[in-house]
Amino acid sequence: DFSQIICCALNKRGVEWSSLGDEVCTQTLSKERHLIISDTSKDCDVNSDKFETYLRLHKITKVVVLVANSETFDIKVKRNGAIKYFHMPVDLSELSHAKSFYLNLFLEQFLVKHVNLPCDDPETADLVALLCKLAGSNASVLINGPTGTGKEVVAKLLHAKSARKDEAFIAVNCAAIPENMLESMLFGHEKGAFTGALQSNVGLFRAAHSGTILLDEISEMPLTLQSKLLRVLQEKVVTPVGSTKEIAIDIRVLATTNRNMLQEIQANNFREDLFYRLNVFPVSTCALKSRPLDIPAIAAHLLTRNVSENGTPKILSTEALNKLVQHEWPGNVRELDNVIQRAEILSCANEIGHTDIVFDNDLTFRPRNTFEALNSKLDVKVG
């Protein structure tokens, strides 16, 4: 039934849930609680005083009612928008891209503030299950995968599921910070340690104390700094630039890379000892083309991302969904994000059609040709 399907989808995303009346689970859930009523519109009167009392008693902040598309459900009291209902226009018992899209579109109504990994592919669901187990450890994790496959989302999920979730999560792009500034940014510096150091700086490692730090694109870190990072990981101390004092830190270190690290070691671009210190538990993210079942779920997430609290996201037609699933996605999720944003702009209706799906290789970087490619979509004359 609806309930089993929803619970299965929540499990795939690594989202905790509890059944009504499960007081033990209710006490352990986050402060912002949601109630899902599925396929029970005839049995549950959300307008009753009894229901109102139940919401206050359990500190439930939002109610989402899932009903079949053929049903009508009149909610007389909106509770300032706290009660919403979502019509399911497809049969959830059928396996289809449309079913996956609408189910995940429904889940996005109340998962906006919850860190989770939109997915429907069995391998991705297995990855989420692994991450939930791994989150309980303080071990370093090296996340490897092609650009645009969600490595930072994986890192955020590890942090959100850990005991450190209420502490800082700091991401550092090792490729974006100049080499002469990276050591100071990471480990801090004392006042006067170098020209321009007008005041002391604690550094990102100390700023993330008790929390998690993500070293994004760790393979781009200069060799001279790798040895200092190795000592930080081994001894759990940092030494600010211009100081001889070691400062203890309690921190979990995650790292990402899109390179083959063994090849980087052989080319003397990365220290072997640092690799093994980071690679306590390796995790890999796959290219989007190898997990097409995730595409409807990710598309639903992208369409609801910028919608206001009481707004309605656009939907994808069956033809548009099929077009997305059949694409190769060389740019992975980043490319999918671009295509979805483009489709939202081009679509004049609430439903995005297959003609609104324009891939990057359909466009050029020449303004005239780009305008001509979009001209039929926008229905305007160009120059």
Model-flagged regions — what are they?
Residues L105-D126:
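Dynamic helix-loop-helix/coil hinge segments at AAA+ ATPase domain boundaries and subdomain interfaces
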Residues Q27-L29, L57, K133-L134, K161-K165, ...:
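Conserved catalytic network of the ASCE P-loop NTPase/AAA+ motor domain
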Residues N116, L130-L198, R206-P222, A287-P292, ...:
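Conserved post-Walker A coupling segment in P-loop NTPases
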Residues E179-S184, R206-E235, I251-A255, M261-D273, ...:
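Conserved AAA+/SF3 P-loop NTPase catalytic/coupling segment centered on the Walker-B
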Residues L127, L131, T149, V172, ...:
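Conserved RecA-like P-loop NTPase ATPase core
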Residues D1-L111:
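N-terminal accessory segments that target, anchor, or regulate ATP-driven/P-loop NTPase machines
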Residues D120, V154, K165-E167, G242-R252, ...:
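Nucleotide-binding/hydrolysis machinery
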Residues W17-L20, A193-Q199, E235-P240:
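Short gly/ser/thr-rich secondary-structure transition/capping motifs
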